[in-house]
Design a protein with these regions (language model features):
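Extended ligand-binding regions for polar small-molecule ligands
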Residues: 89-98, 158-161, 171, 176-179, ...
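A ligand-binding cleft/hinge motif common to bilobed small-molecule-binding domains
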Residues: 129-137, 185-186, 209, 214-243
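C-terminal motif of bacterial Sec signal peptides marking the signal peptidase cleavage site
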Residues: 15-19
Length: 285
């Protein structure tokens, strides 16, 4: 603003002289005006360039806040050394490396992760979240799918339950606000069972093994991994699986769309270069 005012002042003064001074003064006026305008344009360009540089620096310094579940093996869990590991954890790391963004991941639990994203305390979550139309309609925005999984039922190893018919009058366990909960809820009236809700899978599994509930519903690869690796004392009941759905990275705030776009681009790259298959094989064989 000060530069423009100066240009106007110089121009007005010179024009006043030209009225009395003839053609030489007119030439001087034109030269002065052109030079001042050039200075103003250069200053504006410098300011714009500085703003772009500042914005770029801010973007490069940004650390995205990502949340995940606490115990959803093999997708996220804490190993014997206390380190957070799993398919989700490694996929996110590979994508961030491919796309060149920084992030911090916090293992806070399924319910807490949902709440953190909805409250704006986290930018996104990766926690084996199935992509559904219902979740999309409630405000969630998903990446492309990165893993297909279905849900099924498991019982204690010594149980004689062989299907849904054996659940009548009994209680089954599910994880709150999960696809497995939706699956069980869709069957409970038909087969006459009650539902008990848990915050995490390990606690739910212990309820089955301990006899507090007759069965549990959970994502099939999660139960299979836990049964195989921890001698859990459960078995998956054949013929109880539903149709598979894709897991996706999720955000709740549309202003974070950049994060989803980077996830999608990176996912495509790590599938193409073999890194994705390497990660999955590490945990599922």
């Amino acid at each position: 603003m000060k530069k423009s005012a100066l240009v106007m002042a110089v121009t007005m003064a010179v024009l006043g002289l030209s009225a009395c001074g003839g053609s030489d003064t007119t030439a001087t006026t034109a030269a002065a005006t052109t030079a001042a305008a050039a200075d103003t344009t250069a200053a504006a360009d410098t300011t714009a360039a500085a703003a772009e540089t500042t914005a770029a620096a801010a973007d490069s310094d940004k650390v995205w806040q990502i949340v995940t579940d606490t115990a959803f093996k093999p997708f996220e869990y804490t190993d014997d050394s206390g380190k957070l590991v799993g398919i989700d954890v490694d996929i996110l790391a590979a994508i961030a490396d491919d796309q060149g963004f920084k992030y911090e991941i916090k293992s806070i639990g399924w319910d807490a992760s949902i709440a953190a994203c909805q409250a704006g305390q986290a930018d996104g979550m990766i926690a084996g979240a199935s992509i559904t139309d219902e979740r999309k309609s409630s405000g969630w925005i998903f990446s492309d799918g990165y893993y297909d999984a279905n849900q099924s039922m498991a019982v204690a190893e010594n149980s004689d339950i062989t299907g849904f018919d054996g659940l009548k009058g009994k209680s089954v366990a599910v994880k709150t606000a999960s696809m497995s909960a939706d699956y069980a809820e869709s069957l409970k009236d038909q087969y006459g069972f009650e539902i008990t809700y848990f915050e995490d899978s390990p606690t739910m599994y212990q309820a089955v093994v301990g006899g507090q509930v007759a069965a549990c519903f959970d994502d099939t690869p999660i139960m299979a991994s836990n049964i195989k690796d921890t001698d859990l004392g459960m078995k998956i009941v054949d013929g109880t699986g539903n149709d598979p759905a894709e897991y996706g990275f999720a955000i709740f705030d549309s202003s974070k769309q950049e994060l989803v776009d980077m996830f999608n681009a990176g996912l495509k790259d790590i599938k193409a270069n073999g890194k994705y298959d390497e990660i999955v094989a590490t945990y599922l064989g």
